[in-house]
Amino acid sequence: MRFCVSPNFYACPTDSINPVIPFIGCDTAMSQKIPTQDNSPNPVKIHQPDHDAIAKGRKIQSRSISGFFSKIRLSSMTFVILLYSLLPWVNWEGRQALLFDLSHQQFFIFGWTFAPQDFFFLSWLLMIAAFALFVVTVFAGRVFCGYICPQSTWTKIFMWIEHLTEGERNARIKLDKAPFSGEKLIRKSIKHFLWFVVAFATGFIFVGYFSPIRNLAPEFFTGTLGGWGYFFIGLFTVFTYMNAGWLREQVCFIMCPYGRFQSVMFDKDTLIVSYDSERGEPRGKRKKDVDLKDAGLGSCIDCQLCVQVCPTGIDIRDGLQFQCIQCALCI
């Protein structure tokens, strides 16, 4: 058997073992490409998220919606508001049921009384609460953020007032873009006045957890409260007004560490709100009776409704994001 040297291979036989197959020059045969067929699926155009949208400081105008998860969220937030507002007024054995009396260095929690030397038990209580929060996050995701977090709850109140005074989402956007007018001044003034009333009530009740609230009300309006009392009521009034009225979701994005912790507490079994890209992509408008397979479209019609109802202004279709508070309004 004779061999010839090929520039692409070490050697190839020039004598055919099978006499039926004619000899083809080694260099010529090896230089010809074997015909192939591309059987890969058609590429899917994936929507790329706008990561700079939050950094641009755009104002989020969410749309009102009703549904199963919306009703659950409203019920849980109503419970939180009522619990916060009414608990200081409850008496237990002739005194305020829940009172953190700093002046006398005593904490009253219903039938228990804690002195400074008992702070060890309060520390355990706080650690148990934190551990319970982490356990809930591992199994159910950020349901705390979406349903009972005070920041989300008070933001919901302020957004409801905004909807009441300025209208639905499109009307609010139109009002913000409109030039200054008497109607705009009246609507904005009423909104901020109601915001201030809610913020003041929140600050007043909060101070009532540290000073007997039944004495706090007459002392405040008669001017006998004292400088520190007025200071802290004013401080928490401004704090609530700014957080729920202006900062809103920015508190969750920047100031709250819990949103950052979620990435290390999630696993493959954690319940989260997510978008099924295999079913929804490629997204796009379509006619009513169009065949999705023939049109090369997924189930998502790209109506933007899931984005408009989101209180944090994210697009759930962009994948898992730390800004998502798992309120499930997009479902």
Please give the residue ranges for each predicted region.
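Serine residues within intrinsically disordered or low-complexity segments
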Residues: 3-6, 16, 31
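N-terminal cationic leader/targeting segments used for protein routing and processing
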Residues: 9-11, 19, 34
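Generic short N-terminal amphipathic or hydrophobic helices
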Residues: 16-23
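Membrane-embedded alpha-helical bundles of multi-pass integral membrane proteins
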Residues: 31-284, 307, 328-331
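Short, flexible, mixed-charge glycine/proline-rich loop motifs
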Residues: 136-139, 242-248, 291-294, 298-302, ...
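Membrane-embedded translocation segments of transport machinery
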Residues: 278-296
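Structured cytosolic domains appended to multi-pass membrane proteins
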Residues: 311-331
